Design a protein with these regions (language model features):
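Short, surface-exposed interaction patches in beta-rich subdomains
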Residues: 17, 45, 64, 75-80, ...
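Asp/Glu-rich intrinsically disordered low-complexity tracts
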Residues: 2-8, 103, 122, 127, ...
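Short linear S-[DN]-x-LW-Φ motif typified by the pepsin-like aspartic protease active-site region
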Residues: 2-73, 90, 109-113, 149-153, ...
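A generic local structural motif
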Residues: 16-18, 87-89, 108, 127, ...
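Short amphipathic alpha-helical surface micro-motifs
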Residues: 13, 32-34, 53-56, 70-72, ...
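N-terminal start-of-chain detector that recognizes signal peptides
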Residues: 12, 22-26, 61-63, 91-95, ...
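Extended Gly/Ser/Thr-rich low-complexity repeat segments
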Residues: 42-43, 79-95
């Protein structure tokens, strides 16, 4: 039986709107700051610049350029009901970002096949999965959320700073939990990964096994 709410939503203002502007061709960084909803970021063949598809009943999602950063932001508001937006960000195939920042309150975010020189993830109670390539430093901070990184490369390509409460952090074959102080692992690598976890979970997987 169909949920009557669904039909209301479909006939309401929750159409998908596609946002793209010539200025997006200048984007070197992508900054996504969303309070709730479902976000998907992936590469797409046949487009020349970043494109954002937004389905947001309350039209709170904003996309704009700030110098060389494309910002996709959504302010939390007091909304009736729990209608969460769906946002799809398409990046041209082979387009390497200088930096990808994901700040998710309670949102669910999947990033697939994206290459960036720096990755920053901050989540409260959300769930984030990043599958792709990071040719640089990684910072992950989660409260009670779940973050999974599926990275190209190997575990010894990074140095690590790991901080963990009652949650757990898995990096390749290493497992960390209930750390009384920040743990540093120096692999004499060119890049550093900072992982900070409260009661959530962070899992980092690599496609090259040591």
């Amino acid at each position: 039986r169909d949920d009557p709410d669904d039909t209301d939503r479909a006939s309401g203002s929750s159409q998908v709107s596609t946002v793209s502007d010539p200025s997006y061709a200048q984007a070197r960084k992508l900054d996504v700051d969303i309070d709730k909803g479902v976000i998907r970021v992936s590469e797409k063949e046949g487009i020349s610049q970043i494109q954002v598809n937004v389905q947001d009943t309350y039209n709170r999602t904003q996309c704009y350029m700030d110098e060389f950063t494309l910002k996709v932001k959504r302010e939390s508001g007091r909304s009736r009901g729990n209608e969460a937006p769906r946002i799809e960000i398409l990046i041209p195939a082979g387009y390497g970002l200088d930096k990808l920042s994901l700040d998710m309150g309670a949102a669910e975010c999947t990033v697939l096949g994206v290459t960036t020189s720096k990755l920053e993830i901050d989540t409260g109670v959300g769930a984030i999965t990043f599958s792709g390539t990071v040719n640089g430093d990684v910072e992950v901070e989660t409260g009670v959320g779940d973050v999974t990184l599926n990275l190209t490369g190997s575990q010894d390509g990074y140095n690590y700073q790991v901080e963990c409460g009652v949650g757990s952090i898995d990096v390749g074959a290493e497992h960390y939990t209930m750390l009384s102080h920040e743990t540093h692992i120096n692999n004499k690598a060119p890049y550093t990964m900072e992982l900070e976890c409260g009661v959530g979970n962070i899992a980092v997987n690599f496609d090259q096994i040591l």
